[in-house]
Amino acid sequence: MTPLLELKDIRRSYPAGDEQVEVLKGITLDIYAGEMVAIVGASGSGKSTLMNILGCLDKATSGTYRVAGQDVATLDADALAQLHREHFGFIFQRYHLLSHLTAEQNVEVPAVYAGLERKQRLLRAQELLQRLGLEDRTEYYPAQLSGGQQQRVSIARALMNGGQVILADEPTGALDSHSGEEVMAILHQLRDRGHTVIIVTHDPQVAAQAERVIEIRDGEIVRNPPAIDKVNVAGGTEPVVNTVSGWRQFVSGFNEALTMAWRALAANKMRTLLTMLGIIIGIASVVSIVVVGDAAKQMVLADIRSIGTNTIDVYPGKDFGDDDPQYQQALKYDDLIAIQKQPWVASATPAVSQNLRLRYNNVDVAASANGVSGDYFNVYGMTFSEGNTFNQEQLNGRAQVVVLDSNIRRQLFPHKADVVGEVILVGNMPARVIGVAEEKQSMLGSSKVLRVWLPYSTMSGRVMGQSWLNSITVRVKEGFDSAEAEQQLTRLLSLRHGKKDFFTWNMDGVLKTVEKTTRTLQLFLTLVAVISLVVGGIGVMNIMLVSVTERTSANDIPMDVGAGASYVLYHLFFRYPCKVLPAVGGALGITLSLLIAFTLQLFLPGWEIGFSPLALLLAFLCSTVTGILFGWLPARNAARLDPVDVLARE
């Protein structure tokens, strides 16, 4: 009869400083299907090392080990895990149950890595627990079970994928005598069903119940009686779980790992909340500062635009403060007409101004009287609360009409509902009111100067008696570069005057400077917020590093149930909060930032607080990457461990 497990000259050594310590010394052993074998020996004899090699948790340094005729030395880590999963079931002295899973869920674990569908897993787990007398304990957690019940759960787990070979490491060592007898009775039943049972023990009473007792001493077999010729294999032990594709195993394991992650979060609510708090605060800080900072920037830019954006002012002289008489009359009405004909000009308005007294009945105030064209209000984005601007007929006829600002309207006509049509004195000239320009609300503050506007032809011809302009304001068409327009304007007037006796002031340059300044400030504030996010990420990293490091012990790495290195990797990475926790924290942080923004909107109604999808996405990705980076690395290191090293940590 061909042996099920065949070992020839197996040697296993471990480094100890500069030397190699040989633990197994030429072990040759055959174990047949359906046998119940006990391996006995004192502590340090090598029996546990032999068990690990038998169960494909470790590889021999030299020698040949065949399982059902297959040489395990030719298999890689994942293929070895598959062989282990399909042929072996482990029963440990300390049970190695997952504390946050129920008895039923613990039994299901081996089938998760075999790719079995959830419904099939559930039915199989319930069947096994019922067979072992735990049908009323399926929803109990390990802490709610006695030692004997926990060991029965571990036996059911060992049988989940068929368990052709049951390896029991001191199965009664942590149990009282009654529970120990129950466990041994179950092992006898498994033998009767056709399972091969290998018991590793130092208890002679337990070993005596086996059909064959193999004794090992100092790494060598000192007693190895022959196998019994007639072995009961009537039951057969074909694997319950059929081999499935790697992709199906991955998808099944991935889904189950995410489910386990949520269970882990729910089982430790306070720790979960405290761990997420750093991420929540960091995300909320980043998003809130970006959103509020952008709103503040838009507010400032709106104020700049209210002054007149995309405009170029032309003044006589070399620069501000130049009062040289030869330059005061540099700008003429013909210059205005020439500028208005340029293709890049949306509108152009002249300006002549003088401080005058305004009178209505017994009210007398000082104001700045400005001669402008009807386009002036469009250039500066001003609107009217009453009436309208000048028309071309009024400009050509030097009409005695005037537009008031809201401050003058309030002082001259405090009790009138409609002032259009009223007549006031501008200096000594009577003028009819045709409109009231709406006051511009600005976070930069409103001007204290009272202003009125008259047609520039009226101002220069009837009031001031001058034929030149104090300034010209040009609004550049949308789509034209303001800097290029300024160059063309300078070239045009220089050619007309034969010299450069004027200077320009481009508001677009001011706007760009303000934008650059606000961007710098916003970047600074964002960096401050990012620091808080990094601090929160470091806290999460610490928790995850500790969690993953702690969970590389055998009771949390499923290598003992046949998970390969790739499955251990995503088991640790996805099952624990390494991905779920930062993602949830990021979502809660974004929610908190939305609440903060809406609250600010109530207290700052003038601010247009909007949310950038890019900012929200980047903040969320940042928190998720934190979990990926600081969860993946420890999980990868854990996946590279040999199963026997993992078991040794317990």
From Swiss-Prot:
Belongs to the ABC transporter superfamily. Macrolide exporter (TC 3.A.1.122) family. It comes from Shigella dysenteriae serotype 1 (strain Sd197). Homodimer. Part of the tripartite efflux system MacAB-TolC, which is composed of an inner membrane transporter, MacB, a periplasmic membrane fusion protein, MacA, and an outer membrane component, TolC. The complex forms a large protein conduit and can translocate molecules across both the inner and outer membranes. Interacts with MacA. ATP binds at G41, A42, S43, G44, S45, G46, K47, S48. SUPFAM superfamilies: P-loop containing nucleoside triphosphate hydrolases. This is Macrolide export ATP-binding/permease protein MacB. It is a multi-pass membrane protein. It is an enzyme of class 7 (translocase). The chain crosses the membrane at residues 273-293, 523-543, 554-574, 580-600, 613-633. The keyword Ion transport does not apply. InterPro entries: AAA+_ATPase (IPR003593), ABC3_permease_C (IPR003838), ABC_transporter-like_ATP-bd (IPR003439), ABC_transporter-like_CS (IPR017871), MacB-like_ATP-bd (IPR017911), MacB_PCD (IPR025857), Macrolide_Exporter_MacB (IPR050250), P-loop_NTPase (IPR027417). Its main location: membrane. Its EC number is 7.6.2.-.
